[in-house]
């Protein structure tokens, strides 16, 4: 009964449509030509889930995230090297820079902190 079922499976794989190079019919390799059960008297054993280790999906996702963040760091370094240097010092050339904060802070609070120190 199993043997007949395997023959049906094998015969259904032999009727692929012809591809451009003629290899889907098994002419290129013999990996799919002899479909059969396990040979040499080897038996398979049952397996149980391994709950003490991480799954492969979780491991691959973590590796993908680490690689992505490392590549992002390289892209940021590349962008930073394309910038020019600032030749003029901003703080010494703009003497009224601190006066732009006066609408935000009241002068009384600023003078209170300045007088204590």
From Swiss-Prot:
Organism: Saccharomyces cerevisiae (strain ATCC 204508 / S288c) (Baker's yeast)
Misc note: Partially overlaps RPL43A. Disruption phenotypes caused by deletion of this gene may also be a result of a defect in its overlapping gene.
Taxonomic lineage of the native organism: Eukaryota, Fungi, Dikarya, Ascomycota, Saccharomycotina
Name of this chain's protein: Putative uncharacterized protein OPI11
Knockout mutant characteristics: Deletion results in the overproduction and secretion of inositol to the growth medium.
Biased composition (Low complexity): 31-56
Region (Disordered): 16-56
Protein origin, superkingdom: Eukaryota
């Amino acid at each position: 009964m199993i043997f007949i079922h395997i023959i049906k499976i094998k015969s259904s794989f032999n009727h692929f449509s012809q591809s451009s190079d003629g290899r889907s019919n098994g002419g290129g390799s013999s990996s799919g030509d002899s479909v059969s059960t396990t040979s040499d008297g080897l038996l398979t054993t049952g397996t149980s889930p391994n709950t003490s280790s991480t799954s492969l999906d979780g491991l691959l996702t973590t590796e993908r995230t680490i690689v992505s963040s490392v590549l992002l760091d390289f892209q940021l370094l590349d962008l930073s090297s394309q910038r020019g240097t600032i030749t003029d010092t901003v703080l010494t050339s703009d003497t009224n820079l601190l006066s732009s904060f006066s609408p935000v802070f009241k002068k009384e609070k600023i003078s209170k902190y300045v007088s204590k120190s």
